[in-house]
């Protein structure tokens, strides 16, 4: 029997190991993000070799129920040996509709359906903005913004200076508008929002693939945009506005704007006839004083308009009546270039006065959700949650998760589930790929026709070699 300090040390060592195991099993555990599905919130970039590490507190759900927009680590029900990290988008009992980059709660049926956008809390919204300008220009290592990233009207009225632009109104209207022809305009690009050293290899890989887009993952224009700048004026303007123009086929053209006139601001929506205001907020105070730089920002996000001055929110205005729910998808014939009948154009406009200087120009876009293969109306069963990755273009999540059950006999030959020879039902994740492509690490089942074999990973992570040929299922 051990006595003295050796025994005490062994006891202490044993208790420490037991405590560590219990802590890891029940309380807290560290994970490395393996994939890109939650980027850029949580990095798991193979292209840039960047993998965030997170600390998961397992006891949180003991004290409170999961909430919408929570980031959650969970065991994938169809492959329980894998931990997934996603964001909770749908709650038990929800009826969801995904369109135009937003997620909606649906009430009613048919023509009586009512859509209510699910808005992110302000602090989360701030974190999920993805910078487009100057990030895209810097990613391409370009030094100038005119005329490729921005266009100007009239062109002679706008000059590019170090750190910004000048607009000469000469008593008329001049405006600067975002076009970014190199990356297709205000489109949901997978590399938006990343640091340049991460975005560049991601974009280069896409270019190497010819900017091909999975047919189940269409690119879309992004109507939810925030733009801002520091405005310096030499003398009083008749009007200065930050505007977002949205054009979609078979839908009315909308221009959302934060306009400043005579020391007053207003949030407004105009249609194809810009002389007609479809809706507007109450006026609010906002000053543009000659010789005093002022930071202004404006966003159209989650069917509301928001204005800020020097970081302080001035006004919000509900714009659900003039929604961009439909018409955002880009045809597959040319998925990298937004056609002329589908575009989102952030604009900086000024009328009257003299020279206007814009610095710290910035354009961000919102997190853009796409439906992909999910049904039009998504019914979330009671006791279940609808999970999506922040990087919707590279996320395998609730939109595409599908279970498959295969029957086998005692020799692992595939047989119909209702066959008397069926002695076992194997359940797992259905993530089959094109047989001509390279296998994916999570691909299952994998068919090997020349060997009369199907490789399948069951729900417990066991790799099984089944005998049979691929069929319609």
Regions found by a protein language model. Name each.
Residues 1-473:
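Extended hydrophobic leader/signal-anchor segments used for secretion and membrane insertion
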């Amino acid at each position: 029997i051990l006595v003295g300090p050796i025994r005490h040390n062994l006891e202490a060592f044993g208790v420490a190991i037991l405590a560590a195991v219990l802590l890891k099993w029940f309380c807290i555990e560290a994970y490395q993000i393996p994939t890109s599905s939650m980027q850029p919130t949580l990095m798991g970039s193979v292209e840039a070799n960047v993998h965030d590490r997170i600390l998961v507190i397992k006891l949180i759900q003991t004290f409170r129920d999961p909430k919408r927009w929570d980031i959650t680590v969970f065991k994938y029900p169809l492959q329980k040996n894998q931990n997934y990290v996603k964001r909770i988008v749908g709650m038990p009992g929800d009826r969801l509709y995904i369109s135009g980059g937003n997620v909606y709660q649906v009430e009613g049926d048919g023509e009586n359906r009512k859509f209510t956008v699910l808005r992110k809390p302000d602090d989360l919204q701030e974190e999920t903005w993805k910078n487009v300008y100057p990030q895209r220009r810097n990613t391409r290592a370009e030094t100038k913004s005119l005329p490729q990233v921005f266009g100007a009207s009239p062109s002679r009225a706008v000059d590019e200076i170090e750190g910004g632009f000048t607009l000469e109104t000469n008593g008329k209207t001049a405006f600067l508008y975002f076009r970014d022809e190199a990356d297709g305009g205000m489109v949901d690009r997978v590399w938006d929002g990343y640091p340049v050293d991460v975005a560049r290899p991601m974009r280069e890989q896409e270019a190497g693939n010819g900017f091909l887009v999975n047919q189940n993952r269409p690119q879309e224009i992004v109507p939810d945009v925030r733009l801002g700048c520091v405005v310096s004026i030499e003398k009083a303007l008749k009007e200065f506005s930050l505007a977002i123009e949205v054009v979609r086929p078979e839908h009315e053209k909308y221009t959302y704007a934060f306009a400043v006139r005579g020391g007053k601001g207003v949030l407004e929506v105009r249609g194809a006839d810009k002389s007609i205001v479809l809706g507007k907020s109450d006026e609010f105070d906002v000053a543009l004083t000659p010789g005093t730089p002022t930071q202004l920002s404006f966003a159209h996000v989650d069917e509301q308009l928001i204005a800020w001055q020097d970081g302080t929110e001035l006004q919000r205005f509900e714009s659900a009546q003039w929604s961009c729910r439909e018409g955002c998808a880009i045809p597959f014939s040319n998925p990298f270039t937004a056609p002329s009948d589908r575009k989102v154009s952030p604009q900086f406009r000024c009328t009257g006065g003299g020279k206007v200087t814009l610095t710290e120009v910035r354009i961000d876009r919102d997190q853009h959700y796409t439906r992909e293969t999910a049904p039009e109306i998504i019914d979330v069963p009671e006791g279940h949650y609808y999970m999506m990755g922040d990087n919707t273009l590279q996320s395998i999540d609730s939109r595409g998760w599908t279970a498959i059950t295969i029957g086998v006999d005692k020799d692992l030959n595939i047989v119909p589930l209702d066959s008397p020879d069926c002695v076992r039902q194997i359940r797992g994740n259905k993530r089959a790929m094109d047989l001509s492509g390279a296998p994916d690490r999570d691909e299952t089942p994998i068919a090997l026709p020349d060997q009369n074999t199907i490789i399948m990973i069951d729900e417990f992570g066991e790799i099984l070699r089944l005998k049979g040929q691929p069929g319609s299922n």
